[in-house]
């Protein structure tokens, strides 16, 4: 490549007629391997075309043409990053790899040349520095830890460098065969490439500087991803080893970060055609491995990311096998998550669709039938389909490819849930069990379990309750006897009363009177937090005992019985647990406990009526007018209370549950995505909770006081009966004091019930105008 200057010097000697004084006799010019080269790449074997320890002639002794020919040879060396006789590199022995890329060593020309040609040559020398920077970047980023995207970027840069080398070879060849080849000609040939080379250098420099800035702003301990550390600790690694390895691990720019930088640079250099052309080429080539990982994720549900450079992160410690023991949707929420720093700008608006497309396919893969179907599909069409998948971000079908994959994944999972997993049948079973729809089995269960349910919550035997529930579910003639899903129903005892639990959730969410839809979103987040605790009842109980006081006897934890603490649980296998998740089941449990509380108060009032009807003290007319009037007032109050409870039950079941259930099933029929299905399910439950007055602190308190008054009055029936016996059968004179006391007690119940009922009506009127218009129907029933 390098043109020898011996002929030039020999010609000079013959013309002058005397030998060159600076040269020793018998000296020979040849290529030698210099062991202590000053090149920044001296750690590698590199050829330095230097005169072997001899002193060179002063270039000022050469004529202008000889100097130009000499500099052409020197420049061809410098263009390849090598020193020559008269062109040398600055001393860069102490430079690091990073400094070599950011600030590559510059070449300089020894003095003695004509200033005109020296200036021309000096302008072209930066090509050699840029070449050194680019080759240093290629070598450093080709290591395996930098990932596929950096490897693809380096491959694109190598192709660019190869074109550059071909140009230098062509220039060298032209200089040999063309006697008129001059520095100006060389400059003309290399000028476009010089601009491109400089642009590539600037791009790579900015890339490294931006990454260095991000690395310096990250945490010193390297604990930015706590999930990775926890996974390593769960695998049995020592904590000191994990932390030290994390600290020593160098943070590198790779994957989506590289693509993001190149994309942002396209905008930055929008007005520079040369830079834009280079960036478009680099982005296209660098995005190929990323696009391949993207296609494998959205079309196959697989993550092939050994270098953690893809936008989807997989937590290997979370598997679907855990869902057999715990029906949480943690697998859905946490197993696959988005790496925010690895999302390219091209996917920012599509990142959720990318995430869910792969998730849906992954769920299908977890099911045996889905695996068979997907395997047969892949075996048949995989090769042909992969040829149609976009390979770069600038493909015209890039966005359409993601949307089609998203639609296909949705349809696959929806079909799986609706057909083989019998989702609709499970939803109807939940309605029977939790909303007490056609609940003949539940009446039988309450009759059999009432002795156990009357005990304080801490003394209740869950085993007995479960046995009695199983007997009721299997009783011939009931709707549940033929239900194939009754095996999923179990009994639990929540040590906290319903009202206190709801008040706690409301206090967390910060809902106040008159809150709007924004408050409802906070409610949704708050109730979701209960699902994330793991075992809500035990954790909440300990916190409640420290910070919450009961609002009433019905809501008091001191002596609550099984009627106030019992709840059902519904455990389903994966993938149904994605729809019937813990978040959804908690909502079902809240509604069930509310309906059970209403049914229990209704049963107490009905039992009170039975006692009044059968007991002679109530049934027979009294000769005392005051006693007879007191009994009529007591009957009337009990009737008012029973009517109130029955109106609440009718409103919540017939006008809230049934009305929204029909709408919900209609929305399910029209659902086109699994996300829509899950959202419609949660929206249905939240609407029911809201219209059942379970999401508002004021309505909760008033309901609690009303139900407490009704329950206490019903439980006081036996005391009233004994007092009537004493008054009717007293051998002595009529006990006016006892009668006055009975009238005072009854008047207190009447006042309490009337006052709280009026408060409930006023509150319903207010919230019907600000939040839920459905409450107007309840107001009309309560005031009718």
From Swiss-Prot:
Cell location: Cytoplasm, Cytoskeleton, Microtubule organizing center, Spindle pole body
UniProt entry tagged with the keyword Cytoplasm: yes
A cellular-component GO term for this protein: meiotic spindle pole body
Record-linked Gene3D superfamilies: Gamma-tubulin complex, C-terminal domain
GO biological process per UniProt: astral microtubule anchoring at mitotic spindle pole body; cell division; cytoplasmic microtubule organization; meiotic cell cycle; microtubule nucleation; mitotic cell cycle; mitotic spindle assembly; nuclear migration by microtubule mediated pushing forces
A UniProt-annotated Pfam family: GCP_C_terminal
UniProt entry keywords in alphabetical sequence: Cell cycle, Cell division, Cytoplasm, Cytoskeleton, Microtubule, Mitosis
GO molecular function: gamma-tubulin binding
Main location: cytoplasm
Highest taxon of the lineage: Eukaryota
UniProt keyword Cell division present: yes
Function in brief: Component of the gamma tubule complex that is required for the regulation of both interphase microtubules and mitotic bipolar spindles.
Similarity comment: family membership: Belongs to the TUBGCP family.
Alphabetical list of PANTHER family matching this protein: GAMMA TUBULIN COMPLEX PROTEIN, GAMMA-TUBULIN COMPLEX COMPONENT 2
Subunit structure: Part of the gamma-tubulin complex. Interacts with mcp6. Interacts with mto1. Interacts with mto2.
Protein name (record): Spindle pole body component alp4
Species this chain originates from: Schizosaccharomyces pombe (strain 972 / ATCC 24843)
Gene: alp4
């Amino acid at each position: 490549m390098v043109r020898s200057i011996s002929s030039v010097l020999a010609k000079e000697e013959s013309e002058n007629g005397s030998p060159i004084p600076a040269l020793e006799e018998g000296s020979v010019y040849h290529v030698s391997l210099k062991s202590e080269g000053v090149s920044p790449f001296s750690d590698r074997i590199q050829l330095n075309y230097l005169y072997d320890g001899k002193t060179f002639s002063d270039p000022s002794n050469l004529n202008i043409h000889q100097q130009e020919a000499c500099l052409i040879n020197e420049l061809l060396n410098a263009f390849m990053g090598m020193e020559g006789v008269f062109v040398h590199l600055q001393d860069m022995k102490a430079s690091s790899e990073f400094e070599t890329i950011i600030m590559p060593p510059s070449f300089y020309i020894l003095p003695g040349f004509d200033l005109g040609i020296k200036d021309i040559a000096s302008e072209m020398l930066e090509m050699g520095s840029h070449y050194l920077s680019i080759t240093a970047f290629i070598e450093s980023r080709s290591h395996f830890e930098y990932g596929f995207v950096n490897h693809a970027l380096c491959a694109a840069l190598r192709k660019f460098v190869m074109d550059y080398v071909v140009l230098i070879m062509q220039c060298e060849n032209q200089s040999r065969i063309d006697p008129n080849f001059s520095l100006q000609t060389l400059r003309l040939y290399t000028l476009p490439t010089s601009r491109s080379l400089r642009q590539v250098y600037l791009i790579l420099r900015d890339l490294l500087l931006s990454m260095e800035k991000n690395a310096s702003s990250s945490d010193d301990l390297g604990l930015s991803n706590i999930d990775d550390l926890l996974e390593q600790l769960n695998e049995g690694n020592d904590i000191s080893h994990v932390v030290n390895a994390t600290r020593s691990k160098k943070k590198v720019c790779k994957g989506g970060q590289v693509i993001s930088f190149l994309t942002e640079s396209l905008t930055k250099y929008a007005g520079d055609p040369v830079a834009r052309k280079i960036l478009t080429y680099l982005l296209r080539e660098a995005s190929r491995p990323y696009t391949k990982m993207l296609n494998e994720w959205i079309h196959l549900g697989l993550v092939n990311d050994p270098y953690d450079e893809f936008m989807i992160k997989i937590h290997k410690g979370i598997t679907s096998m855990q869902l057999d023991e715990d029906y949480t949707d943690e697998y859905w929420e946490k197993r696959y998550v988005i790496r925010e720093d690895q999302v390219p700008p091209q996917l920012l608006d599509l990142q959720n669709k990318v995430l869910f497309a792969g998730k849906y396919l992954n769920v299908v893969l977890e099911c045996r039938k889905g695996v068979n179907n997907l395997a047969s599909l892949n075996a048949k069409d995989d090769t042909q389909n992969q040829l149609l998948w976009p390979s770069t971000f600038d493909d015209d079908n890039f966005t359409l490819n993601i949307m089609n994959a998203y639609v296909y994944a949705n349809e696959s999972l929806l079909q799986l849930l609706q057909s083989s997993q019998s989702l609709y049948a499970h939803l109807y079973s939940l309605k029977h069990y939790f909303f007490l729809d056609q609940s003949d089995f539940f009446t039988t269960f309450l009759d059999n379990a009432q002795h156990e349910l009357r005990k304080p919550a801490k003394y209740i035997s869950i085993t007995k309750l479960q046995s009695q529930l199983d007997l009721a579910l299997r009783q011939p003639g009931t709707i549940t006897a033929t239900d194939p899903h009754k095996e999923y129903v179990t009994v639990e005892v929540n040590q906290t009363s319903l009202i206190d639990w709801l008040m706690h959730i409301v206090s967390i969410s910060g809902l106040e009177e008159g809150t709007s839809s924004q408050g409802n979103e906070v409610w949704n987040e708050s109730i979701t937090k209960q699902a994330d605790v793991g075992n809500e009842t035990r954790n909440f109980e300990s916190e409640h005992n420290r910070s919450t006081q009961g609002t009433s006897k019905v809501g008091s934890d001191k002596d609550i019985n099984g009627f106030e603490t019992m709840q059902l649980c519904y455990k389903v296998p994966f993938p149904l647990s994605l729809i019937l998740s813990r978040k959804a089941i908690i909502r079902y449990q809240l509604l069930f406990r509310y309906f059970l509380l209403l049914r229990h108060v209704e049963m107490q009032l009905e039992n009170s009526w039975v006692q009044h009807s059968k007991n002679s003290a109530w049934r027979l007319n009294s000769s005392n007018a005051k006693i007879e009037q007191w009994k009529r007032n007591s009957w009337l109050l009990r009737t008012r209370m029973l009517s109130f409870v029955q109106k609440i039950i009718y409103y919540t079941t017939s006008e809230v549950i049934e009305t929204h259930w029909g709408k919900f099933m209609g929305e399910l029929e029209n659902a086109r995505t699994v996300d829509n299905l899950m959202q419609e399910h949660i929206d249905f439950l939240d609407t029911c909770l809201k219209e059942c007055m379970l999401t508002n602190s004021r309505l909760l308190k008033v309901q609690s006081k009303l139900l407490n008054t009704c329950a206490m009055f019903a439980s006081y029936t036996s005391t009233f009966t004994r007092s009537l016996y004493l008054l009717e059968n007293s051998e002595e004179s009529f006990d006016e004091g006892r009668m006055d006391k009975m009238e005072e007690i009854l008047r207190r119940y009447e006042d309490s019930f009337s006052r709280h009922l009026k408060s409930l009506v006023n509150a319903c009127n207010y919230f019907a105008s600000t939040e839920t218009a459905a409450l107007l129907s309840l107001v009309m029933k309560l005031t009718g």
